[in-house]
Design a protein with these regions (language model features):
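Alpha-helical solenoid repeat scaffolds of the TPR/TPR-like class and their adjacent stem/linker regions
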Residues: 1-497, 502-574
């Protein structure tokens, strides 16, 4: 019992002298004989809460949180102000997935001993699990103020800061975590994630390398290293093979690692290696990020193997509106196989896709589904038809606006006074890559020479762009008239040229067969491939790529020069 007596003497010295984690570390080395003696002491002295607390800790670290709760509740009944027991009880409640009870325990521990750091730390962990990032950040900082050398608090603070996009601060926190425990792989990997978010790609690779030096089978580090190398490869193409090798290492280390398969799929698809990429793309359904859109159907998945003659198949949208527009083209091929075809898409696309060849019925998502023999998500159709770069179907116009909407827009726009150019410069603000792919209008305006008839087809103009739009009276703002994609399609047809960033509008305009110039950020989406100015998916598209992330002067200068050539202005008659 010497170890027990020494530990309890330390606890008795006063508030803040011993933390929960230190206690766990000390009892981890106790022999079974010590625990047997402690159990006997607990029987002989049932009112001693410390004995019950230590037994509860042992149950907690032995993976028995239910038993820990029982023992710790008894300890607290004898000693309600036992902050270390309250902390342990909170941990046990969290392990049993009882977050509200866990939070109450941590709050009581803080109340009884506000000088302890670990109740703040464990409460921060609970807040983190609930997605309450800002509250978690506050508690991690409280923990660090009391325990400056608690490595895991610095590490987890960095993770929370990364979650809210405060990457420079995350780098600072994770750098401190690495200093405190340089021989542990996890902080190095997490530092790499923060550096990646801050755009410091080379340093991110170095951090992942250090993590892999410590743990060569660290699948997450290998996967993240692949992502950083892949983004570096936009400026340094020779890094692509190393990125793919990193994904392979992640898969070898963790054969069911869906994120590595997903990232490798995106890389292969972006390089046009469709034969390898489409099968791997099916791993998307195992990703946590896809759980909200994964669906169960009463019919089997069709991936091209079964005959569709005389069968009914449901094709359904799954991701963005642009994806539905891009991949609905396969409907005609499905119908040619003798199928009765039902196409389910977002309600805003139903009217537009009525012009598509192939579907017998187009329905809005959420409507009652007819009986079907098979189903297929739209982005699985390229796999089903073994698509490669030379057999992409319907690369020219495959959608058209309703004739009555076309007449309406022709009348609304009136006679053309000069070459008419439609503009879209930003996409959905909620898109995870919006800060890279969208433009500020003031960035675009200097590259739009006067003399053209510009039409803003930007449905939602952001507050910061309104003043700049009003300052250019030669740009007609028609965004408020675009009630759905049928209206937008009719407006597009009345343009001589569409200039857009990478949004669903780009897919719509190109699917209509209209000349569409697309400004692409670096890195760009896999759908636009690499190192080319055209798209095999859309004959009428022309791509203006960034070569350096965030640098729009290059692609916009090329676009302005091309505009003079493609749509030369003629002098008005005298």
């Amino acid at each position: 019992m010497q170890e027990v007596d020494a530990l309890l003497a330390d606890v008795a010295r006063g508030a803040g002298c011993l933390e929960h984690g230190e206690v766990l570390e000390r009892i981890r080395s106790w022999q079974q004989s010590t625990w047997d003696a402690l159990s006997q002491e607990a029987i002989e002295f049932p009112l001693n809460g410390n004995f019950l607390w230590l037994q509860g800790l042992n149950a907690l670290q032995s993976g028995n949180p239910a038993n820990a709760v029982e023992l710790l509740c008894q300890a607290i009944a004898h000693h309600p102000s036992h902050a270390l027991a309250q902390t342990a009880l909170g941990q046990a409640m969290a392990a049993l997935d009882l977050p509200a009870a866990a939070m109450e325990c941590f709050a009581l521990a803080i109340h009884w001993n506000p000088d302890l750091g670990e109740p703040f730390f464990y409460r921060a962990n609970a807040l983190y699990q609930q997605g309450r990032w800002d509250a978690a950040i506050d508690d991690y900082r409280q923990a660090i103020a009391r325990r400056p050398t608690l490595m895991q608090a610095h590490n987890n603070l960095g993770l929370a800061l990364t979650r809210v996009g405060r990457h420079p601060l995350a780098v600072d926190s994770l750098s401190r975590a690495v200093e405190l425990d340089p021989h542990r792989a996890e902080p190095h990997c997490n530092l790499g994630v923060a550096l990646f978010g801050a755009g410091r790609l080379r340093e991110a690779v170095e951090s992942y390398d250090r993590a892999l030096d410590i743990d060569p089978h660290y699948a997450e580090a290998a996967n993240n290293r692949g992502n950083a190398l892949w983004d570096l490869a936009y400026a340094e193409p020779e890094r692509r093979s190393a990125a793919l090798a990193s994904y392979d290492l992640a898969i070898a280390s963790k054969p069911d690692y869906e994120e590595a398969y997903w990232n490798k799929a995106l890389a292969l698809l972006q390089t046009g290696e469709y034969a390898q990429g489409w099968p791997l793309y099916e791993w998307r359904w195992r990703r946590r990020a896809f759980a909200p859109i994964a669906r169960n159907f009463d019919c089997p998945l069709w991936l091209g193997l079964e005959s569709l003659q005389g069968k009914t198949i449901l094709l359904h949208g799954e991701q963005g509106l642009g994806d539905s527009i891009q991949f609905c083209r396969y409907a005609a091929l499905v119908q040619e196989m003798g199928a009765q075809l039902v196409l389910e898409v977002d309600a805003c696309l139903v009217g537009l896709l009525g012009s598509l060849r192939g579907p017998d019925q187009v329905i809005a998502r959420g409507a009652a589904l007819p009986r079907a023999d098979f189903h297929c998500p739209l982005l699985s159709l390229p796999l089903a038809f073994q698509t490669h770069l030379n057999n992409i179907p319907a690369a020219s116009a495959y959608l058209a606006p309703a004739p009555e909407r076309l007449i309406h827009w022709r009348q609304m726009l009136g006679p053309k006074r000069a070459p008419r150019v439609g503009l879209v410069w930003s996409g959905d603000p909620a898109h995870r890559n919006d800060r890279n792919r969208s433009l500020l209008l003031k960035t675009l305006l200097p590259y739009l020479p006067v003399g053209y008839e510009y039409v803003s087809l930007q449905k939602d103009v952001r507050e910061g762009d309104r003043v700049d739009l009003a300052a250019r009276p030669d740009i007609r703002d028609m965004g408020q008239a675009l009630s759905d994609f049928s209206e937008t399609a009719a407006a597009c047809v009345e343009m001589d040229l569409l200039i857009t960033v990478d949004t669903s509008f780009a897919h719509l305009s190109a699917a209509l067969g209209k000349p569409t110039w697309i400004l692409l950020s670096a890195p760009s989406d896999w759908r636009w491939l690499l190192d080319r100015e055209d798209s095999p998916w859309y004959n009428s598209a022309r791509l203006f790529r960034q070569h350096i992330t965030g640098e729009w002067d290059g692609p916009l200068s090329r676009l302005a020069y091309a505009l003079h050539t493609y749509l030369p202005l003629t002098e008005p008659a005298a």
